[in-house]
């Protein structure tokens, strides 16, 4: 697996930085885009919404002059000053009277701070709002506290220095100081800004608003400093790579990779030679040589000293190396790096870096030499680094087998050193000489001589023999040529056999299982990576796009660990799938207001439909003109919405963007691009899935649509007449207008000939204009487009119904011998027998041509004129087929029959307007069609015997 690099791609952390700067200061601010018309608001925090009572949906895209917060008592001079500051891109502070949503007013102190880019151009404005009454209360409380402290201090000091009889006593001064508290409380409760602006009091210092501005100058300067144009305080609105402190080393840099491999080789050297040196340091021969030739007589000791120095340098480098925290963020702050290293591997690295050879050189006693030699085995703690370094290769089968073999050999090497140390320690004290070293000397003809320290087998013979014994014992293949003879040797042999049986069973006995288990994940990774590379090679993807593909694949693999959630869920029953999905999306379903009040079953059904997606910075989620078939919920990160490369909105956590599906029968097209600024986690649900679930829970559907607040509606309002609104009474249209029942219901069916009267009707149905003329014009255009959209959809349905009815009429005229389907109520066969044989199609005088029209063909209006002609001599009972291109066709009679009934075959067809043709979600389905009205039912023909004549 690749190195865990963390979130190292360039990110636009503008919004996250501003929120992090302000979250501990209880700020109420908004951000406006200076490059848009009217400096539209693109973000407002929760504190602003709580202060004024508006939701974020109601504030977004409004001008940053905040005209919606002004009222009748708002001074025009303050509004002009604010507008002038925005127009001139100047920093200023404005004291203004604003109104909340509930019509309550309060005095507000507004700080306007322009934000410039790297070229010096103003791109954004940040407006900070403070309640002036709260500032006065804080300033007054601080002033009272200071005065109480000063009075108490002066009173206590004066009581000791004032002569008797001069001034009040200590008791009276104390009482006076305390007596001010109730009076201040009363004044504070009855505090009136206008009353105390002109007046003054001797007991309590009432601060005027301009004094508040002066006293809060430091606070405002802090805000300005936070919002200043310096690159080290306020981030620029652009993609920025993570800032790395000077002197720190990236954990994925080439230098760190080379250094890690060098340390890895040194650790392997330590693991091999440290037990060997510790075992042979116990020999008197080495000690005697050390005393005669000094510390540098052994090259191995010099190498050990160099290794110790390298380990110390590695500790210093680790204090300056970045790491990845639990949030996949690269941490480069030296203090945080030091704390993280102290809590982790510092103790192990420090113990392993102690230069024991220097201590041995300074102390010459045998006991100290033996102890220090044993302590050198602490260097084996460095093997933890090997496991940490090689863990990333644990999914490669060949590497795993190689590591297992090396581990087996390393353990055998350690046991061989211990086996030699046991024999070397016991040999001088054994009588008779039955140890394995004496037996080896007898076999080789190199017996030990007590007077000659150099006697006996060579070091190579002793080490190879010890290694041979440990390998044969670990693999349970003992030949007996090297055998334990003393009790210590036998106990050690038992331990070796126990370790060998465990290792043999766990490693060699399960090699096939280890290979299969380890190859599964890496096989999937390499298979997917190979597909990506083949796709890139086949389609000749350019290098920048190729790099994005590979980085996204690696990041997505590390993010999901190659787990396909859909494939995993398919193996579980549906009830368990719903529970798992409910757990995965629990944060969204619990905190989003739109899902509150839903039943457990509804939440389970919604959770199954939700999908989670992860987007890296710079990835475009929605392009301009894309079909809006998905609703997105942001759970982490921030995104920007662009129109013509101009930022129109910045969305963050808990924001929603897309299109409210309740307002339109068909999905619209996106009016902007949606691009990720940081690494984002989003929940998305398809339009069809959402409507399907809400159709199953109609009681919750109304609550959901009322509570759903889409932070930014991406639907293109000017994209043409594409869909029909699916609305409920009292809801909002796509542009935010509230429609009543008469406006949102199905409009009457209008004919093509009546389109000339459309404009006066639309003008009469328009709602009252708001006070702002510009908003009035925008509302009129949007309402007009909405009405035209309704009209177009209803005319399309009307045309399909008329074509269907005409095809049925032509089919009836083609088959005169059969029973007419339009004769309703004829039940007896005798009625058909008595029906006259002369019909319209058999008349010689008739010129009605229908024989060449296929029965399944649907005719248009022009084709009908070619096939249906009016005869010259037409019987009173012969039907006149008249076409009205803009009306629904129904039969009418030229002569009224007795009883007020109409004969369809003796009368021409007359037009009839049928209200309410729309309103069905799927009008083409038979089960959704409404019942036939009574005036549409064809009556019996006059020659029908069942017809009652008067």
UniProtKB/Swiss-Prot annotation:
Q: Where is the composition biased (Polar residues)?
A: 740-750
Keywords in UniProt for this one?
Answer: Cell membrane, Ion channel, Ion transport, Membrane, Potassium, Potassium channel, Potassium transport, Transmembrane, Transmembrane helix, Transport, Voltage-gated channel
Cytoplasmic side: which ranges?
1-261, 320-340, 392-398, 512-950
Record's catalysed reaction(s): K(+)(in) = K(+)(out)
Q: Which GO terms describe its cellular component?
A: monoatomic ion channel complex; plasma membrane
Quaternary structure, per UniProt, is: The potassium channel is probably composed of a homo- or heterotetrameric complex of pore-forming alpha subunits that can associate only within their subfamily.
Q: In its UniProt entry, what is this protein called? A: Voltage-gated inwardly rectifying potassium channel KCNH6
């Amino acid at each position: 697996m690749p190195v865990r690099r963390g979130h190292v791609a360039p990110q636009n952390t503008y919004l996250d930085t501003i929120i992090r700067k302000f979250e501990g200061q209880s700020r109420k601010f908004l951000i406006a885009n200076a490059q848009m018309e009217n400096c539209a608001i693109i973000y407002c925090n929760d504190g602003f919404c709580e202060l004024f009572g508006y939701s974020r949906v109601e504030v977004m895209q409004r001008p940053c002059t905040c005209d919606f917060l002004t009222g009748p008592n708002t001074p025009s001079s303050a509004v002009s000053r604010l507008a002038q500051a925005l127009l001139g891109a100047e920093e200023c502070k404005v004291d203004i009277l604003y109104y909340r949503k509930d019509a309550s007013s309060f005095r507000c102190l507004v700080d306007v701070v322009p934000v410039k880019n790297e070229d010096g151009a103003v791109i954004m404005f940040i407006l900070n709002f403070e309640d002036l009454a709260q500032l006065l209360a804080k300033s007054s409380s601080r002033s009272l506290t200071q005065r109480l402290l000063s009075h108490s201090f002066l009173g206590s000091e004066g009581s000791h220095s004032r002569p008797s009889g001069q001034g009040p006593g200590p008791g009276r001064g104390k009482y006076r100081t305390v007596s001010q508290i109730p009076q201040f409380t009363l004044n504070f409760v009855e505090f009136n800004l206008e009353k105390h602006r002109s007046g003054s009091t001797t007991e309590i210092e009432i601060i005027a608003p301009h004094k508040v501005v002066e006293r809060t100058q430091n606070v405002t300067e802090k805000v300005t400093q936070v919002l200043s144009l310096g690159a080290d305080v306020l981030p620029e609105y652009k993609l920025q790579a993570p800032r790395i402190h000077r002197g720190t080393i990236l954990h994925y840099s080439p230098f760190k990779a080379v250094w890690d491999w060098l340390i890895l080789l040194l650790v392997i050297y330590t693991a091999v030679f440290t037990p060997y040196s510790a075992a042979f340091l116990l020999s008197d021969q080495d000690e005697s040589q050390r005393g005669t030739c000094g510390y540098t007589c052994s090259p191995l000791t010099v190498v050990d000293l160099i290794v110790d120095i390298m380990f110390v340098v590695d500790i210093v480098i680790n204090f300056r190396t970045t790491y990845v925290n639990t949030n996949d963020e690269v941490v480069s702050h030296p203090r945080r790096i030091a704390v993280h290293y102290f809590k982790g591997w510092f103790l192990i690295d420090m113990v392993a870096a102690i230069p024991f050879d220097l201590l041995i050189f300074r102390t010459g006693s045998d006991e100290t030499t033996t102890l220090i030699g044993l302590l050198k085995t602490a260097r084996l703690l460095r093997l933890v680094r090997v496991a940490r370094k090689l863990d990333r290769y644990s999914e490669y089968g060949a590497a795993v087998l190689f590591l297992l073999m090396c581990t087996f050999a390393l353990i055998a090497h350690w046991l061989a050193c211990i086996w030699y140390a046991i024999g070397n320690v016991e040999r001088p004290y054994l009588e008779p000489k039955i140890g394995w070293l004496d037996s080896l000397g007898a076999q080789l003809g190199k017996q030990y001589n007590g007077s000659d320290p150099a006697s006996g087998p060579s070091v190579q013979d002793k080490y190879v023999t010890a290694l041979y014994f440990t390998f044969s014992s670990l693999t349970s293949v003992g030949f007996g040529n090297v055998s334990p003879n003393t009790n210590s040797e036998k106990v050690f042999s038992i331990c070796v056999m126990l370790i060998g049986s465990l290792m043999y069973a766990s490693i060699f006995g399960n090699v096939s299982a280890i290979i299969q288990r380890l190859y599964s994940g890496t096989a999937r990774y390499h298979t997917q990576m190979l597909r990506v590379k083949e796709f890139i090679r086949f389609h000749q993807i350019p290098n920048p796009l190729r790099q994005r593909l590979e980085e996204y694949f690696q990041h997505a693999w590390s993010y999901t660990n190659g787990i396909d959630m859909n494939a995993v869920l398919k193996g579980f029953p549906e009830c368990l799938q719903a529970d798992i999905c409910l757990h995965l999306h629990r944060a969204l379903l619990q905190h989003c207001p739109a899902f509150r009040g839903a039943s457990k079953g509804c939440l389970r059904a919604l959770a199954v439909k939700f999908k989670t997606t992860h987007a890296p910075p710079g990835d475009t989620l929605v392009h301009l003109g894309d079909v809006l078939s998905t609703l997105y919920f942001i759970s982490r990160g921030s995104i920007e919405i662009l129109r013509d490369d101009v930022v129109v909105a910045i969305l963050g956590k808990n924001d929603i963007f897309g299109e409210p599906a309740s307002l339109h029968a068909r999905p619209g097209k996106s009016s902007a691009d949606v691009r990720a600024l940081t690494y984002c986690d989003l929940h998305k649900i398809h339009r069809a899935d959402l409507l399907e679930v809400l159709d199953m829970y109609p009681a919750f559907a109304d609550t959901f649509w009322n509570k759903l607040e889409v932070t930014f509606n991406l639907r293109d309002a000017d994209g043409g007449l594409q869909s029909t609104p699916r609305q409920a009474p009292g809801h909002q249209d796509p542009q935010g207008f509230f429609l009543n029942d008469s406006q949102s219901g199905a409009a009457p069916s209008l004919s093509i000939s009546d389109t000339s009267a459309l404009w006066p009707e639309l003008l009469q149905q328009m709602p009252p204009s708001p006070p702002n003329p510009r908003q009035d014009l925008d509302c009129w255009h949007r309402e007009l487009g909405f009405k035209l959209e309704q009209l177009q959809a209803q005319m399309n349905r009307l045309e399909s119904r008329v074509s269907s009815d005409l095809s049925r009429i032509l089919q009836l005229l083609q088959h005169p011998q059969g029973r007419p389907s339009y004769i309703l109520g004829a039940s007896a066969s005798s009625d058909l027998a008595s029906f006259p044989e002369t019909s319209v199609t058999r008349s010689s005088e008739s010129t009605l041509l229908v024989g060449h029209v296929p029965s399944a063909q649907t005719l248009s209006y022009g084709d009908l004129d070619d096939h249906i002609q009016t005869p010259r001599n037409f019987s009173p009972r012969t039907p006149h087929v008249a076409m009205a291109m803009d009306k629904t066709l129904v039969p009418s009679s030229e002569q009224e029959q007795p009883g007020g009934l109409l004969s369809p075959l003796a009368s021409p067809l007359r037009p009839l307007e049928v209200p309410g043709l729309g309103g069905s979600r799927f009008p083409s389905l038979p089960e959704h069609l409404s019942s036939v009205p009574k005036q549409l039912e064809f009556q019996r023909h006059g020659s029908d015997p069942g017809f009652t004549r008067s």
